[in-house]
A protein has these predicted regions:
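Boundary at the C-terminal end of the N-terminal hydrophobic targeting segment
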Residues: 16-18
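Periplasmic-binding protein-like
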Residues: 49, 99-110, 128-130
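Short, well-structured alpha-helical segments in soluble
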Residues: 88-103
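Flexible loop/hinge segments that line or gate small-molecule binding clefts
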Residues: 113-149, 160
Length: 163
């Protein structure tokens, strides 16, 4: 079912989204289309992405996009997966691995709803949330999906398709 929802949402987005456009969501129901500027990293940034798992289509598709973007922009991306949800200790150990590797930022798809002592652990490394919100003031930015639209658009499509 997740795959179907993802595909339907992707189809909805195709009309507004292309390689040159971004959707900026203002709230659950309103977005504007913004042109994106093609970028190339001036140096090989070292980014470390932590995912709860790579066992389902959602995180696999996110990882595919991240890998493609890293390749396209000339960024060195290290990916670690925690083996499932509720794996705080695993992800804390992975942050240490990222720091030893020389990561310049952490892209955190948290496996838990809170991440105690995140500030102490990452020190000055920027943290960008991937999908799962922590609501931690340390987090610099968040990349996610509009959850309302993820359900609404496939439902809307199915209603229209059934007529």
């Amino acid at each position: 079912m997740r795959v179907l929802l993802f595909l339907l949402l992707s189809l909805f987005m195709l009309s507004a989204f292309s390689a040159d456009n971004l959707l900026r969501w203002h709230d659950a129901q309103h977005y504007t289309v913004q042109a994106s500027t093609p970028l190339k990293a001036k140096r090989a940034w070292k980014l470390c992405a932590l995912y709860p798992s790579l066992k389902d289509s959602y995180w696999l598709s996110l990882n595919y996009g991240m890998q493609e973007a890293a390749r396209r922009y000339g960024v060195d991306l290290k990916v670690l997966e925690a083996g499932g949800y509720s794996q705080l200790a695993t992800q804390q150990a992975q942050i240490d691995q990222c720091k030893q590797w020389g990561a310049e930022a952490i892209l955190l798809g948290s496996s838990t709803t809170s991440f105690p002592d995140l500030q102490k652990q990452v020190a000055n490394l920027p943290v960008i949330e991937l999908v799962n919100a922590l609501d931690d003031p340390l987090v610099k930015s968040r990349v996610g999906v509009p959850w309302f639209q993820m359900g609404y658009q496939p439902g809307r499509y199915l209603v229209q398709w059934s007529h």
